[in-house]
Amino acid sequence: MFPSSGIRKLARSEEMFAETHNFIGLAAHVKGSMDADALSDAFDLLLQAHPVLGGHLEQLPDGKWEIVLDDLMHPGIEVVELTGDEPAPPLIFDQTVSLVHLRLTIRDGQAQPTLYIHHSLADGHHQFSLVEELFSTYTDLVTTGTTKPVEVHPAPEPLEVILANRGVEKRTRSGLERLLAAMFVYDLPPSRRAPSDVNPVLPQLVPMAYCTLSEQDTEKIIAFCRANKLGLNSLLSAAVLMAEWNVRRTPNIPVPYVYPVDLRYLLSPPVSATESTNPVGIATYLAEIEKGTDIAELARDINDTYKKDIAEGVIQQSFLHFSPQYVGNPPGLPDVVMFTDNGIVPPLRTPPDMEVAASHGEFYFAVGAGIEIYTSKIFNGQLMIEYHSHGPDREKSVAAIEEQLRAVVARQSGVG
């Protein structure tokens, strides 16, 4: 037996990720060669800088989960070489063994490193910061043969501690109240978010469909937002909701919407990228859409609702009331849309002969059905929408969103 020590128990905001064995992946599509040995060394240094990444979860007698470190060395990166359409071997995630994994896939000479991390340790912002650090260290090693001394970081704090340290307390409203107006009111079709009766023992990849807009079309989307004084997040939210409304073919039923809000820059003092695991709040909106609804007006109402909830402190303390469920749907409520906009992703630092041309996200859950998650980002100037779903019509939903976005592009192209 190797000696182990408990770091801390998972907070309530983190427990749901342990219950569903949820790992998130961020893949980089690389042009140019990649040195596997240097990447391995960079990963080792990342683990040294963030010791909690070398830990695992253990379930306590009361059913709660604890982050535990031991003296076992992390197995390091996994290198997989493939040719043509050869399928990659399945990834095996076990949160009681490891919380982070780095796979370097080399297909016909093209490299794709993917960093996977347990969602209880990091949200997307936190994860991207780790990827930035990994690539920066890799670049130093490849170009100079050395790197700066390792700065060891403490284990990230849960959201609850971050809020308490900043005087954010539970208020009367949770934000869910506005969705109650649609609960047990409508004759609803079968839910796409219905959970499976039997779940896999280990996490499985949630299938994904996606679309990517060109740089030119992405610029027009941004120009449309500027011209109409809209946030990109609000416009993309409106596009997703209008697409969902069209696909559902239930025109008289509103579309409930929940989305995460990064609190790092909304709290005082601000929260650094890796200071907390998942420092987010949850925003809500009930989309009342009808034939002729204008996407800009819908986006403006989403934005106004968001600003009001932020001003009243509702979003900041929402997690003190509830934790959003990724699996299943509240009874009596139309299927909830979940959408995360990651904004404009900055370029990663790389050696001169290497470029990260694109990226994509992956979700792993130990569930067989019920996951419905939209995400978006702008990387290398191109807007990408991803739809992670167990449902049968992923491509249809993505095509409906792309249709909404191309209508915005056409609208902006006709200006002037």
Swiss-Prot record:
Reactions it catalyzes: 2 a mycocerosyl-[mycocerosic acid synthase] + a phthiocerol = a dimycocerosyl phthiocerol + 2 holo-[mycocerosic acid synthase]; 2 a mycocerosyl-[mycocerosic acid synthase] + a phthiodiolone = a dimycocerosyl phthiodiolone + 2 holo-[mycocerosic acid synthase]; 2 a mycocerosyl-[mycocerosic acid synthase] + a phenolphthiocerol = a dimycocerosyl phenolphthiocerol + 2 holo-[mycocerosic acid synthase]
Site keyed Structural role in the organization of the active site: positions: D123
Any coiled-coil regions, as ranges: none
SUPFAM superfamilies to which the protein is assigned, alphabetical: CoA-dependent acyltransferases
InterPro entries to which the protein is assigned, alphabetical: CAT-like_dom_sf (IPR023213), PapA_C (IPR031641)
Disulphide connectivity of cysteines: none
Active site: H119
GO molecular function, one term: acyltransferase activity
Family annotation (Pfam families): PapA_C
Any one GO BP annotation for this protein: lipid metabolic process
E.C. code: 2.3.1.282
Alphabetical UniProt keywords: Acyltransferase, Lipid biosynthesis, Lipid metabolism, Transferase
Entry remark concerning the domains of this protein: Consists of two structural domains that are related to each other.
Similarity field: Belongs to the acyltransferase PapA5 family.
Function text: Catalyzes diesterification of phthiocerol, phthiodiolone, and phenolphthiocerol with mycocerosic acids, the final step in the phthiocerol, phthiodiolone and phenolphthiocerol dimycocerosate esters (PDIM) synthesis. Can directly transfer the mycocerosate bound to the mycocerosic acid synthase (mas) onto the substrate alcohols.
Subunit structure of this chain's protein: Monomer. Interacts directly with the acyl carrier protein (ACP) domain of the mycocerosic acid synthase (mas) protein.
Protein name: Phthiocerol/phthiodiolone dimycocerosyl transferase
Organism, scientific name: Mycolicibacterium vanbaalenii (strain DSM 7251 / JCM 13017 / BCRC 16820 / KCTC 9966 / NRRL B-24157 / PYR-1)
UniProt gene name: papA5
